[in-house]
């Protein structure tokens, strides 16, 4: 680039450095910067630069108020300390309170904020203060067995509606939140929680307990197929013994437990018609089924029927005719008699002849009214042509 010499100046009076400076100013005048060009554009508004607020030194009263606020509200609740009307801070922000606490108590700040990577200042000389504590949170209170029972009772009453359970005054769980009740029910009763349709979390303790209970229940509960097979085998064995001894009669036990004793029901207050004593069963030959014991009211009803023989005047019922083809040995008498209910029959007539006086007599004049029958012509044998054929 060829150096430009301004007019009116000789090269003898200026050195090379002065010439270079003069050339730079001329180039800057010919090529203005972008900012200067943008300022000439209409509608351009330059953003105002951020003005930093002046640093105000902390007074002793402000420092004491900060420490008292940390004792009352806990370290970390800077906004609560700032909004507390008992303390006065001059144009301070929550970050200013945190920075001031880090400056005056770096060791305590490191204790409450172990992951802080900010600059730790040197401790300053401050008056003696009482021990500080971090902001208090809700303490975790373990569930008692009584609360678990009431929680389970509330689940039976309201179902998985944890808000209703917490608001139920009869259960006394108002100090527990709905989420606390849900989490406790999931941890204390995982099988009922899963049966209600909820999914268990990936907690190995709950899952192992739940599956262990299910495996124990499956082991103690007999299998349906094995029980059915055992019952079928028992029935087959009893049938085989009965087939081998067809003439053997079952032995009657002298004493059998009553059904009310098995169920542990007292029957001394019940009337006798509501149950049948089974200690000394009375077998009746007049029952419809052989070997069946009937209750007292049913026997009394059967005995109230009239005998079958008393329905006839002769005293003996008419015997049915026996066909010659039927042998005498083929008819087997019944080993028991059946009492039939009374039949309302009318007595038979004294004679088998009909009484003519009871029948209506026909009128002879009625037969004369019929017209006479037409007479048919008779043909002699001589007039028949086919008789003379030979």
Curated annotation (Swiss-Prot):
Residues 244-257, 322-340 have a biased composition (Polar residues). Disruption phenotype: Leads to lethality. Residues 347-360 have a biased composition (Low complexity). Disulfide bonds: none annotated. It is found in: Nucleus. One of its GO terms (cellular component) is chromatin. Residues 50-109, 135-193 form the HTH myb-type domain. It holds the Pfam family Myb_DNA-binding. InterPro entries: Homeodomain-like_sf, Myb_dom, SANT/Myb, TRBD-Containing_Protein. Keywords: Nucleus, Repeat, Transcription, Transcription regulation. GO terms for molecular function: DNA-binding transcription activator activity, RNA polymerase II-specific; RNA polymerase II transcription regulatory region sequence-specific DNA binding; sequence-specific DNA binding; transcription coregulator activity. Residues 32-48 have a biased composition (Basic and acidic residues). One of its GO terms (biological process) is regulation of transcription by RNA polymerase II. Its main location: nucleus. Residues 78-105, 162-189 bind DNA. SMART domains: SANT. Residues 30-57, 115-143, 244-278, 316-390 are annotated as: Disordered. PANTHER family: TELOMERIC REPEAT-BINDING FACTOR 1, TELOMERIC REPEAT-BINDING FACTOR 1 TERF1. General transcription factor with prominent roles in controlling histone levels and stability. Binds and regulates the activities of many promoters, including those controlling the expression of all four types of canonical histones. Is also involved in the centromeric loading of cnp1 and maintenance of centromere identity. Moreover, regulates the expression of cdc2, a protease capable of histone clipping. This is Telobox protein 1. It comes from Schizosaccharomyces pombe (strain 972 / ATCC 24843) (Fission yeast). The lineage of its organism: Eukaryota, Fungi, Dikarya, Ascomycota, Taphrinomycotina.
